[in-house]
């Protein structure tokens, strides 16, 4: 099979898969088809009525239906105007049924695809987000889905409505003069070749447009999210140039596709009208015994053909845009979800954590991030991970809730390998607070009681906020817990956001706490309050703390000193200082040694 044949086969498979999304709307879709059948049937009627109009010019008293009872007295003088009005009404009914019900299918399809894409995002593994441009993900949900809908509904609208129009007109022409009609059929192979050539170009160009649109979304998203950095470092000109370049690239690709269509459509029209010219010559040359009305009706019907044929040929562009968009959408939908082969569910675990000979490589890289890590933590113990940035601390913390899967070594929670737990159940036992806090554009109360915590009693929410020392600023806000925090908590300070994240973790009341730089954004006073709260909360819970501040880790039951993915020292704060080794050097520098170049 050649490359072009393989591509064509792939396009057909993608398109039929896309059409499967129309299945839930098949009843509404059939109503739209009926509407388009009605619409298409009026085209030869209009041509036919002209025959009687022209014949009526020579004999106004002639009747339209001489052999039909009750209508044999109806003269052309009355019948022709009446029929034109009736045909127009019939056509309007068909147009309404077709367009309205197809719009319902189209909008439903947009909704279904967007929801499925978004739902898929929530179950994709972390590694997918590590390697995929966020702008392209957003563009798929917004731009690509619209292109796909055009292929699944708008294209079908043209194919059905204009296709039936062509069929009905050809039937009418064959009935009037089959020999002349065969002349028009002779151009169909040439039209097919032109459509096939244009389709390949349209699909190739559509893929490039969608990638370029993703780049535009990505640059805009990055700049909006980092607007403070942009302004602080005078990056306005750079970002303006970067966005202009991305937008210009998209514009040029759009123009290239428009140019293809602008060349292709006139060429197709030239072929069609050349055939019409030959047909008109033959009609005049071979008119024989045909009446003037017959000739006018035939030419009118033939003259109605170029428009639907042109629209049918142009639908290839819409279909190829949709196929290109659907290909990227289905690629995302076909990505394997997070591995969840576990079967064990526990109502609550004690929090006994044990790591045995754990090693880890990030997917699709050959560099080892963790090497033979082993330690254990009993309920109520606090384990502190210390080391310069890039030593593997956060990677280790991300393996415990299975944000990444491990293949070498074991991580046991209450004596059970974490891979044996059902994923959702495992994460229910873990509360995590990261350095980069995520808040949603909602109220303070809803940000604390998020996800599975939604619906928690207001008293519990307020108690968690108090334990996180967040009440002192919440009570000063005009709407208190009902205050909107803005996108990602933009209306709050860094320390306030951090305390809300800690309150969220406290409300979860999980037996295992992971605090990844959890107090790094707090001022000294806030950190002192948080430390007091954490001392209380950590009782009876396993706590894994990653911190650069001495005050956070000095009380740890066990400190694991990491470097280059290995545990190089372990012990209490006092024991490690007495060893006068790596930890002592970090301690002397304030525990915040920069990462080496290339560290992960």
From Swiss-Prot:
The record's annotation in SUPFAM superfamilies points to: ABC transporter transmembrane region, P-loop containing nucleoside triphosphate hydrolases
Cellular component terms (Gene Ontology): plasma membrane
Do you know which PANTHER family this protein is assigned to? ATP-BINDING CASSETTE SUB-FAMILY B MEMBER 10, MITOCHONDRIAL, ATP-DEPENDENT PERMEASE MDL1, MITOCHONDRIAL
Tell me the gene name. msbA
Native species: Pseudomonas syringae pv. syringae (strain B728a)
The protein's name is: ATP-dependent lipid A-core flippase
Does the keyword Cell inner membrane feature in the UniProt annotation? yes
Q: How does it sit in the membrane?
A: Multi-pass membrane protein
Q: Which Pfam families match?
A: ABC_membrane (PF00664), ABC_tran (PF00005)
Q: What is its EC number?
A: 7.5.2.6
Q: Which residues cross the membrane?
A: 26-46, 82-102, 167-187, 266-286
Question: What UniProt keywords are attached to this protein's entry?
Answer: ATP-binding, Cell inner membrane, Cell membrane, Lipid transport, Membrane, Nucleotide-binding, Translocase, Transmembrane, Transmembrane helix, Transport
Q: Which residues form the ABC transmembrane type-1 domain?
A: 30-321
Record comment regarding domains = In MsbA the ATP-binding domain (NBD) and the transmembrane domain (TMD) are fused.
**What is said about its interaction partners and assembly?**
Homodimer.
CDD domains this protein is in? ABC_6TM_MsbA_like
Residues that hold ATP according to the record: 387-394
What top-level class of enzyme does the UniProt entry assign?
Answer: translocase
- Organism's domain of life? Bacteria
According to the record, the signal peptide region is: none
Q: What does the protein in this record do?
A: Involved in lipopolysaccharide (LPS) biosynthesis. Translocates lipid A-core from the inner to the outer leaflet of the inner membrane. Transmembrane domains (TMD) form a pore in the inner membrane and the ATP-binding domain (NBD) is responsible for energy generation.
Q: Which family does it belong to?
A: Belongs to the ABC transporter superfamily. Lipid exporter (TC 3.A.1.106) family.
Instruction: Enumerate the subcellular locations listed in this protein's record, separating them with semicolons.
Output: Cell inner membrane
A GO MF annotation of the entry reads:
ATPase-coupled lipid transmembrane transporter activity
ABC transporter domain ranges (all copies): 353-589
Reaction(s) the record says it catalyses: ATP + H2O + lipid A-core oligosaccharideSide 1 = ADP + phosphate + lipid A-core oligosaccharideSide 2
């Amino acid at each position: 099979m050649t490359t072009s044949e393989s591509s064509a086969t792939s396009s057909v498979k993608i398109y039929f898969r896309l059409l499967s999304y129309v299945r839930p709307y098949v009843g509404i879709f059939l109503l739209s088809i009926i509407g388009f059948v009605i619409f298409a049937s009026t085209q030869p009627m209009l041509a036919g009525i002209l025959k009687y109009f022209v014949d009526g010019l020579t004999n106004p008293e002639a009747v339209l239906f001489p052999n039909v009872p009750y209508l044999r007295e109806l003269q052309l003088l009355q019948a022709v105007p009446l029929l034109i009005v009736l045909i127009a009404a019939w056509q309007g009914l068909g147009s309404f049924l077709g367009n309205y019900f197809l719009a319902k299918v189209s909008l439903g399809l947009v909704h279904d695809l967007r929801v499925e894409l978004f739902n898929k995002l929530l179950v994709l593994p972390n590694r997918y987000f590590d390697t995929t441009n966020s702008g392209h993900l957003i563009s798929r949900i917004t731009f690509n889905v619209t292109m796909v809908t055009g292929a699944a509904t708008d294209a079908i609208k043209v194919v059905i409505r204009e296709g039936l129009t062509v069929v009905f007109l050809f039937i009418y022409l064959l009935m009037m003069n089959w020999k002349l009609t065969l002349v028009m059929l002779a151009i169909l192979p040439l039209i097919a070749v032109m459509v096939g050539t244009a389709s390949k170009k349209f699909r190739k160009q559509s893929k490039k447009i969608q990638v370029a649109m993703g780049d535009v979304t990505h640059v805009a998203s990055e700049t909006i999210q980092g607007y403070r950095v942009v302004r602080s470092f005078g990056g306005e000109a750079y970002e303006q140039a970067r966005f202009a370049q991305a937008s210009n690239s998209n514009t040029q690709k759009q123009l290239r596709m428009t140019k293809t269509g602008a060349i292709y459509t006139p060429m197709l029209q030239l072929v069609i009208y050349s055939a019409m010219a030959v047909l008109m010559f033959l009609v005049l040359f071979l008119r024989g015994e045909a009446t003037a009305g017959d000739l006018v009706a035939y030419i009118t019907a033939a003259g109605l053909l170029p428009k639907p044929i042109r629209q049918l040929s142009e639908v290839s562009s819409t279909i190829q845009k949709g196929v290109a968009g659907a290909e990227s959408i289905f690629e995302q939908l076909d990505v394997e979800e997070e591995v969840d082969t576990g079967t064990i569910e526990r109502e609550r675990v004690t929090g006994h954590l044990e790591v045995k000979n754990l090693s880890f490589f990030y997917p699709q890289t050959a560099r080892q991030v963790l090497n033979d890590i082993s330690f254990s933590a009993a309920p109520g113990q606090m384990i502190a991970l210390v080391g310069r940035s890039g030593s593997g601390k956060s990677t280790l913390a991300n393996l415990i809730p299975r944000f990444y899967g491990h293949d070498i070594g074991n991580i046991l929670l209450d004596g059970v390998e974490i891979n044996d737990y059902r994923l959702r159940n495992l994460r229910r036992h873990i509360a995590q607070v990261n350095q980069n806090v995520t808040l949603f554009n909602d109220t303070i109360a809803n940000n604390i009681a998020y996800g599975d915590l939604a619906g928690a009693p207001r008293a519990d929410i307020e108690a968690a906020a108090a334990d996180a020392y967040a009440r002192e600023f919440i009570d000063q806000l005009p709407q208190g817990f009902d205050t909107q925090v803005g996108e990602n908590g933009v209306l709050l300070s860094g320390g306030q956001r951090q305390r809300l994240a800690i309150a969220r973790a406290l409300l979860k009341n999980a037996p295992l706490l992971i605090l990844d730089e959890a107090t790094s954004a707090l001022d000294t006073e806030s950190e002192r309050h948080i430390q007091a709260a954490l001392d209380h909360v950590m009782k009876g819970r396993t706590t894994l703390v990653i911190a650069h501040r001495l005050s956070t880790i000095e009380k740890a039951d066990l400190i694991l000193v990491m470097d280059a993915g290995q545990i190089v020292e372990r012990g209490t704060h006092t024991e490690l200082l007495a060893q006068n080794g790596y930890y002592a050097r970090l301690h002397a520098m304030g525990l915040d040694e920069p990462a080496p170049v290339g560290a992960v």
